[in-house]
Amino acid sequence: AGHEVTLLTSSADRVAEIEALGAHAVVGSMTNLDDLVATLTGADVAYLMLTGRATGSLVAHGEMVGNLFKQAIETTGIKRVVNLSSVGADQGPEIGALYVYNIIEGLLASLPIDITFVRPVAFYGNLMGSIQTIKAQHAIINNFPASHRNAYVWPADIAKTVVDAILHPVAGQTVRYV
């Protein structure tokens, strides 16, 4: 309450739904620097996240978007960022596709800004990909040992953490796990 929110969406079809929630919608692309700059100009804080719309290499796409985020922040002069990252962002290329978050964090961390990296664990919703084996075998099949414990998070819990990071800023660079 009391904050103006602008959201960059790639879909004109979502504008009415976004604005019904109380945000101002701007149609554009996170892969277009001009769209990012126009959306972020005048903002006190930016919430940035990588979407799943990569074509080709997720890591190459993420690096490109991370560089665009960095350029947009430099251009607009924003001094406070909350970035949705991922568990594993502190790891190297051996982590696989999650390495993209290491790259993005590195790019953003190089800026002289206050930034909070929000690192959620696995999403509950991703379990839907295992629904067939859950129904047929009463099991979730993964490529790690059965003794491995996995933590899951619900998007609403991530949202609460992001809102808290926006409303209660901390100076410097911080990491919050969800």
Q: Where in this protein do the model-derived segments appear?
A:
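Oxidoreductase cofactor-interface core, primarily capturing Rossmann-like NAD(P)-dependent enzymes
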Residues: A1-E17, T31-D34, T41-A43, T51-H61, ...
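Cofactor-binding loops of NAD(P)H-dependent oxidoreductases
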Residues: G28
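N-terminal glycine-/serine-/threonine-rich beta1-alpha1-beta2 phosphate-ribose binding loop
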Residues: L21
